[in-house]
Amino acid sequence: MSHNAPLVLMILDGWGYNENDRYNAIAKANTPQWDEWWQTCPHILLKASGLPVGLPDEQMGNSEVGHMHIGAGRVIQQDFTRINEAINNGKFAKNAVFHEVIDQLKKTEKSLHIMGLLSPGGVHSHEQHLFALLALCNQKKFRSVHLHLFLDGRDTPPQSALDSLKCLNEELVKHPVATINSICGRYYAMDRDKRWERVEPVYNLLTQGKSEHQFPDAETAIHFYYKNKISDEFVPPTLIGKEHSIQDGDAVLFFNFRADRARQLTSTFLDPLFKGFERKTLPKLSYFVSMTQYDKNLITTIAFPPVPLNNTLGEVLSSHGLSQLRIAETEKYAHVTFFFNGGCESVFTNEERIMVPSPQVATYDLQPEMSAPELTKTLIAAINSRDYHVIICNYANADMVGHTGNFEATVQAIECLDQCMHQVWQALKNNGGKLLITADHGNAEEMFSEATNQAHTAHTSEPVPFLYVGGGWHFTHAEGSLIDIAPSLLALLGITPPPEMTGRILLEKNHAHV
C-alpha cells in the first residue's frame, strides 16, 4: 500500500475569517505562507454556524458540530437543536427516561443530583435544558433535587455566571424543587485530557461533600472569587450551603449534551476499571442518566440516543478501497475520528489514526505552539511514506490558545501554524500531493468584545476559509458551507458523492485550452 500522491484535508481549528483587523490575532500575525496562498490560490468562505450546520439560527459553531458536518457532507440536526425542539413541542416533558427515574426515586425516597454546565453558551449544554428538567420535577411533585453546577466563562464571557444564576433563581421561584449544593469551574469538572488531579476534587465534593471552600450561597462564592481574580472557568470545587453528597440509591443526571468534556467525570462513577485516582467512596447509583451518548463503553441511561449516520466521508473512502489517516493532538483527536465519522466509534477498513500528545500545561497560552511542531513532523513522515490516499489532520492552536483570551499568545500560535503549513506543503509538493485547508468554526479572529468589555474567549459566528493548493482546479461558487467540503474532496479524487451527501461540489477541474 504505497506510492499514493496524498490529498491532505487540513482543519485549522478556530481559524475564522473576519474583515475587521481589530482584535484579530490572525490578521495581526506574520503569516507569509498563508498570505501567499490567499493571493495566489483558489479560495472561498464557508458558513460554519447556525442553520447551515444544524444549529439554531445565529448560534456560533463549535468543534464537534464543525467536524461532524465536514465529515458528513449534509446538515445534521444537532443534539442542541433536537433537545430544544423536544422542549418546544412537549416531547421533553414526556421523555420516558426522565419519568422512569423520577418515579423510581419517589418510590425509594432517594434524591436526584442534576449536574452540568450552567451556561447559555449552547456548546456543551444550555441552561434552558436544566430549567426544563426543573419544570418536569415540579410537574411530577418531586422535590428532592440537588444541583451541582459547573461554570463556563469559556463559551461565554469570563465573568457571566451571575447572570445565569439570576435566571436559575427565577426558575427556582417558579419551580421550587431544588437546591444549589455545589459550584465548580469547567476547568476542573470538564477536563478531557486525563488531568485527574483536576477531576478528583470535583468527585470528592460530589460523593463526600468535601471541599476546601464553602459558602452559604453561590452568589457570595462567585463575588469572593471575582474579587480574587478567579473567573468562572477556574472557580475551584466549592460546597454551597448544607452538604448533600451523592448517596447509595440516588440518581445522577448529567445534562451536558456534548460528549467529549462529559466523559471523564462520568467515568469516575461508571468505569469498572477506573484508575485515574483512588475513589474513597463509590455510590451505588439507581441511575446515571446522560442527556446524550457520551461513550459506548460508559453504560449510562440515555435521554436522547444517537441517530446513526451512513456514508460519511470516511466510510465512502473506505468503500472505494482508499487508505486514510486521521491525525491530531490529544485536544482534537476525538474530533477528527469519532465526530468526523458522524459520532460513530468504529474505525473503517484502511483507516489509521495517530494521536500526538498535547502538552501538559495549565493553559495553552503558556505554550502557544502546543504540539503543532511534533504533529507536523509526524504528518510529513506520513506524506513521505505515500501510504495514504487521504490524510485528515487537525491543528488545535487557533482554537485552544484563542480560548485563553491572550491576544499575544494567539498571535504566536498563528505564526507557528503558518510555519507548519509551509513545511507540510513542501512535503506534499515533493510527493505530487494536493492540499485543502479549512476550519471548523471561528475563534482567533475575534479576541476582544467591546460589548462586554472583556476578552472574547468564545467561538464566533464568522465564516471560515476553504482554500485549495495544488493547481488544476478552481472554485465554481462564491461561497458555501461546511457540508460542501466532503463532496468537493471526493470530486478531487474522481469519486461521485453518495446521495446522502446533500452538500455541493464546489471545485471543478480547469479545462485545458485547445
Swiss-Prot record:
> Which keywords accompany this UniProt record?
Glycolysis, Isomerase, Manganese, Metal-binding
In the record, biological process GO terms are: glucose catabolic process; glycolytic process
Annotated Mn(2+) 2 binding sites:
13, 63, 440-441
Q: Which InterPro entries match?
A: Alkaline_phosphatase_core_sf, BPG-indep_PGM_N, Metalloenzyme, PGAM_B_sf, Pgm_bpd_ind
The active site lies at: 63
One annotated GO molecular function: phosphoglycerate mutase activity
For the ligand (substrate), the binding residues are 124, 154-155, 186, 192, 258-261, 332
Q: Which pathway does the record list?
A: Carbohydrate degradation; glycolysis; pyruvate from D-glyceraldehyde 3-phosphate: step 3/5
What note does UniProt attach to the cofactor annotation? Answer: Binds 2 manganese ions per subunit.
Cellular-component GO terms for this entry: cytosol
Disulfides per UniProt: none
How does this polypeptide assemble, per the annotation? Answer: Monomer.
Q: What does this protein's UniProt record list under function?
A: Catalyzes the interconversion of 2-phosphoglycerate and 3-phosphoglycerate.
| Family, as annotated | Belongs to the BPG-independent phosphoglycerate mutase family.
This chain's protein is named 2,3-bisphosphoglycerate-independent phosphoglycerate mutase
Organism, by scientific name, is Legionella pneumophila (strain Corby)
Q: What is the gene name?
A: gpmI
